[in-house]
Amino acid sequence: MPTNMFRGFENAGDEEGLIFVVLGNDDPGIITWVPNVLIKAKETGLALLDDNSLIDLKENEIPPNRKLLEPISNETLQKFDNYRIDEIEKFICRFKNQTNHEINLNNGIKLIQIIGSSFSNKNYNAIIDHDTGFNLSILKGKQGLIEDLVFDKPTILFSQKGNWKVKIEKNEFNINSKDTFSLPLNTKVSVSIDNNEDCFLNCVSKA
């Protein structure tokens, strides 16, 4: 998602939803709220503070060295970017279109390079051309194995779907759907899947 813009999230379906969020770089910064959010919070007795914490003013006082967030001015509000829907579309990779970008890796495992050009120290063309500070890769497979993956920068695995096996040296770990695994650096990693339908393992690494 582009920065310097306001965004909101809503579950538009009938089932419980999950958004897996990756923030670029090491400092996510401070959230800037639209004025209406802060105004409504104050009306209900809640207060958002300058460290992004939320307190109930009916039960607590503002801690020392903390300040109440005040609504930004109209002048500051005008400095944020606005995008048309067609302009945002280039930042979206639709699930149904991912099959057009699959790369065969080895033994039944395919790679879909969503963001960034690197996966396990090899370069690939990304679907979304956006400098985010991280790489987002997806491993796809029903039954397959890929060995000797090495990551020299902070990397996590997140199982979008399926029960994946991750082997590091002699140790084997089961990564079930919705599980997250932070990998050790500069260590050979093997990943395998054994299922009757396609499964997906997200890999996020620092660029």
Describe the predicted segments one by one.
Residues 6, 163-165, 188:
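Structural motif
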Residues 48-140:
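A short, N-terminal "cap"/entry segment at the start of jelly-roll beta-barrel domains
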Residues 135, 145-147, 153, 169, ...:
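Short, solvent-exposed loop/turn positions at domain surfaces
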Residues 10-11, 125-130, 145-152, 157-158, ...:
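Short histidine-centered beta-strand/loop micro-motifs
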Residues 8, 21, 136-140, 156, ...:
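Conserved hydrophobic/aromatic beta-strand scaffold that supports enzyme active sites
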Residues 6-86, 190-207:
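Double-stranded beta-helix
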Residues 1-3, 169-187:
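Short acidic-glycine-tyrosine-enriched beta hairpin
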Residues 24, 138-141, 149-166:
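Short, conserved beta-strand element in jelly-roll/cupin
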